[in-house]
Amino acid sequence: VYKRQLADYRGKVIFLNFWATWCGPCREELSRVQKDIIDRFKGNEDFVFLPVSRGETRETVAAFREKMGYTFPMGLDPEQKIYRLYASNYIPRNFLIGKDGKVISATIGYEAPEFDELILLIERQLNSAN
């Protein structure tokens, strides 16, 4: 469970991702996250990736993370309280939030070209002077 709020990350580019272990498109998307997001932006203190598992237990998420070999932390939202602040249906659900705290992009589902565009948006935000 994340113990911080989005406001704690003001001034940073935030990639907020809602997912679940049973969701095929979520799993496909997460398979790209390590290489295309975590490794690519590693060490950039202006970037934060917040993956939030929707409706699952700590044990389920921990077992999935270990099985897949992911090194990034995964937040928990077992009762979907956080998710309901952003959406009512469908995962994966992604929000790219700019340094000013405003949503730049919101996507539903996983499609490779859309994910590629998200990576470019992250790069542009990190390279901007704001």
Question: Where are these predicted regions, by residue range?
Answer:
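Short, small-residue-biased leader/transition segments that mark boundaries at the very start
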Residues: V1-Y2
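Short active-site neighborhood of thiol/selenol oxidoreductases, capturing the structured segment around
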Residues: L6-R27
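Short, internal strand/loop/helix patches
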Residues: L50, A62-D100
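Thiol-/selenol-based redox modules, centered on thioredoxin-like
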Residues: L96-N130
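Conserved helix-turn-beta segment immediately C-terminal to the redox Cys motif
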Residues: K12-V13, E28-P51, E66
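Extracytoplasmic/secreted envelope proteins and their assembly/folding machinery
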Residues: L6, L30, Q34, I38, ...
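Active-site loop/turn elements of alpha/beta-hydrolase fold enzymes
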Residues: R54
